[in-house]
Amino acid sequence: MKFVDEVKVHVLSGNGGNGCVSFRREKYVPRGGPDGGDGGEGGSVIFVASEGKNTLLDFRYRHLFKAESGKHGQGRNRHGKGGRDLVLEVPAGTVIKDAETGEPLVDLSHPGDRWVAARGGRGGRGNARFVSSTRQAPRIAEDGREGEDRELVLELKLMADVGLVGLPNAGKSTLISVVSAARPRIADYPFTTLIPCLGVVRHGEAPPFVMADIPGLIEGAHDGAGLGIRFLRHIERTRILAHLVDISQLSPEEPLRPYRLIESELASYSARLGEKKRVIVLNKVDLVPERDRLEALVSRYEQLGHPVFPVSARTKEGLGELLSALVRILSESGVSLPVEDVEEHVGK
């Protein structure tokens, strides 16, 4: 399934039906009164967060969505039928913004959340509504109101318990493929992962949790370098950040540089990311045979004040301790996300 996380759409609600000018025309009733019916209400365009969606692919090639207009009123006090609402399903985690101003309008973060994007036009009143003591035979009726016309941007932010961040080739894809059933593309060159990847992680008897592999960042990402910040929005909804660092490539002179580079990019994107709980994962320890060097690097990273876990995603060394720590932190911070929808797409 192709992953689409941002689209622009044009929504139109239905127009209200016109009211009718009509008079009774019956045998033996030469002066029948007004009997024009009202026009029907126009249908509205409604967005609903659905458990069965995990991408905005349905909106990739179709951009115009219009609800039905209301029917016109008729004689004999027959009111026009209301137009049907147009209900558009989107994944939970979809933010809808005004296309012109960029202002966020609604955040459909939970399945079942609903938002009326364009409300249907009101139906016009028929002439039967205008009878008064001084006007017994009104020859006027109202036209229906026009529906609303809006251009919107739909922006999907994936929801996960743990978000993997780090430079390209830090081993994020390998890690998520080992600890879950996710099968991202893996190769020994930068930017192998071009889209976010979700996986369900099970560890012992603990409740499962959702992990997201976010495409690698590079210096200047917040200014558009590499893959830019397109996928940084997905990190905002994670509860824990797992910052992966390739320990085998650390420079003796500046061992903290890769970590600080990514942290700087995250801070440039959103100050709130700096407040998230995080763990530091020093990956590829199997490529550092010198024990003294390994211990020295771990010690340097421990000084940053976050839990540090030396691991090898390839050999699975240290993964048990890492997963146990993630489970503990998640249990302390609240209920994990439902995993059923993720499992439907990545397997169990």
From Swiss-Prot:
Cofactor: Mg(2+)
Coiled coil start-end: none
GO terms, biological process: ribosome biogenesis
EC numbers, comma separated: 3.6.5.-
Gene Ontology, cellular component aspect: cytoplasm
Annotated ranges, domain OBG-type G: 160-331
Stretch forming the signal peptide: none
Family named by the database record: Belongs to the TRAFAC class OBG-HflX-like GTPase superfamily. OBG GTPase family.
Name listed for the protein in its UniProt record: GTPase Obg
Taxonomic lineage of the native organism: Bacteria, Pseudomonadati, Thermodesulfobacteriota, Syntrophobacteria, Syntrophobacterales
Gene: obg
